[in-house]
């Protein structure tokens, strides 16, 4: 399994080159494989993105939060290291499984980890000294700790390319007018030589290992496209206003030349692998290259570099088991590692944020092997002090400063950058409360930083705290640079308050000021949509798509217009195109469901509703639509009632969360306590969840696992619970709700919260009988233990869990026996209500108990 990373690669530059026959190796790859867009993550900073690619996890979980990190020894900043990563990368997972792997030039890999295989870190290719012929290593000593095994360091040092080794003829492949002297004196050409030398060194290190060492996985990361694009994309045709005719003529061919170089390197790599190797090529984001480029310079120091990054990069797959000549849709950076695991016939961990790109596979089995996690106590970092070369670290920090990625080398500045980046991760993944915490800490250090003020305002808006949001906007009222974003946010505040006309006026003023963008045009379109001005809305969505054809929000809005104007087939197509670009948008799936209903595609509409409910488990809207469809289009009264009840509970919970301050004399709200239902599998936990929900406590569930013969009323599970050990963010809004957690996951609960645990007990033999029946129905064998051994294992688990619970000061426990609940539902409902301390509907709770479901009751002797 080979993964080739091309930082910043974009189909919009690649496709014209392929059409002209200038990237023949990639064309052959695509003809025999599949291709698609891949959605990036926020913030678009390479170390964070490539670590997400290598782990399948968001940055708040993998821990790499930028280009630099504080050095605990010196108190200064240093380039980000492998010790920052808090979870397993794919090469660590394979090492734990005894399978060899290799990684070349990946971000945050120095010092080299001691894996089963080989590592060439992101510091190996950096030229830290002058080239001096005749001296050891030509006066350019290799970086300690940059290669594993260490005995390969001298061998690989011989394949490095120093910038002084890049000849004028090689420069002229990209800049034909360059003279010999200019290649050594012109700052722009000297920068190009440095970047080409780095790229060549990475490629040489990769090819040195490719056919010489065994590997089941190899990751090669080329950063040249992105780095050279920041230096030269502003010269790409068509000529930008700030570029002179002379500079345009001189540098206009650089970027296409860089892509041709990568095609040649791809051809060499493909010759060194066999037909049994699957290959993924991907980028971490795209790069604007045409008339959609932002104003100003593309350089990192002089311009706004992230503005040049496009939301969608490229991904392509080739090899055994991969379809030929097909397209894939909805991929994200988080999907690469799960896909690699699947292609290597290894389970995909349920605590990963991504999913395998099975749409690229020729065949997909009925079931996909999974495991809870690959996280364990093993570490592959070098023992003792991490090897760090002061010269290399200094050179990298100087380069990062010169490029504008970081400020000075003071650790405080880096820590503030990490707060910003972590806050951006939280905000972009729908966790505004956590984002607010990070950016408030930024403002504690830099009270006048308007960018942080605006982000705090955005977080407050998402949380519904409109007055606090406006207070933050007032702080940037005199900043002309912040004015457009502040005006847009004020418009959204007015929209939240129901003043759609006032919001529209602000947006129209923004457009008339000469600041239109796809996002702004789309926002105006949605505002007109809410006001039922469909012609105006359609016009704005079309304008947004003319500017950016791959805008998922504009496509979604256009689909709504189509549906509401009687064009259901066109609406379905628009929503599907939106989802193909960015899959995790629950509202788009809901809009698709409505369009499918208008097109009389009821089964597909139900599927789309379920996806929306799964993606947004606290939103009542998908359940309301499901209830309506089951009642009026399917004729299933039981399922309609189930979803109607679920929607009512979720809407009541939402209302409680948004209520104002409590009046004197009113009962205490639920606050932060979470009610947890736990017990062994098949002990009856779903029944307890039904009782609590019937009583008025909202149940946290994503409806991912549907009802079946074993649980006719549903399983009441939340998939995110399984990842609690590495991501407990689902608890942020779980206060006042009930959730089902198996006993094995209780210890993963963070200790800074209050929990009410309802521990369901049931006769072990009944549990074993129920499990056996379920396994038989599913055609599975279960554990390789006899009944007596299983009984002992379960009894020991119960004993250990109960012992652990007695020592947790933040957990209250109520033990409930399943048999008693079935026999005396009213009595157990009263006990539950007293334990929870709520004014629950005990009659409804008792009514949720169906004695007919007690099918494995133990016969009395």
Question: PLM ranges: what are they?
Answer:
Residues 41, 112, 116-123, 662-737, ...:
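PAPS-dependent sulfotransferase catalytic core
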Residues 267, 298-346:
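Substrate-binding rim/cap in mid-to-C-terminal beta-strand-loop elements of soluble/periplasmic
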Residues 278-320, 353, 369-371:
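Histidine-centered active-site microenvironments of extracellular/periplasmic hydrolases
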Residues 3, 25, 257-298, 340:
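Metal-dependent active-site segment of extracytoplasmic phospho-/sulfohydrolases and closely related
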Residues 435, 469, 503, 537, ...:
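Single-residue signature of alpha-solenoid repeat helices
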Residues 57-245:
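His/Asp/Glu-rich, glycine-adjacent segments
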